[in-house]
């Protein structure tokens, strides 16, 4: 739930491990 992945996502995938996509950012926990 914390946007600390430093990554944006638009297609439902995040490159950062253990990060999930919640447009427009990738979140971890």
UniProtKB/Swiss-Prot annotation:
Keywords: Disulfide bond, Plant defense
PROSITE patterns: CYCLOTIDE (PS51052)
Disulfide bonds: 5-19, 9-21, 14-26
GO biological process: defense response
Post-translational modification: This is a cyclic peptide.
Domain of life per record: Eukaryota
Cross-link type Cyclopeptide (Gly-Asn), residue numbers: 1-29
Function: Probably participates in a plant defense mechanism.
Domain text: The presence of a 'disulfide through disulfide knot' structurally defines this protein as a knottin.
Similarity field: Belongs to the cyclotide family.
The protein's name: Cyclotide mden-H
Species assigned in the record: Melicytus dentatus (Tree violet)
Lineage: Eukaryota, Viridiplantae, Streptophyta, Embryophyta, Tracheophyta
């Amino acid at each position: 739930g914390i946007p600390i992945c430093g990554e944006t996502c638009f297609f439902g995938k995040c490159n950062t491990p253990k990060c999930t996509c919640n447009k427009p950012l990738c979140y971890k926990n």
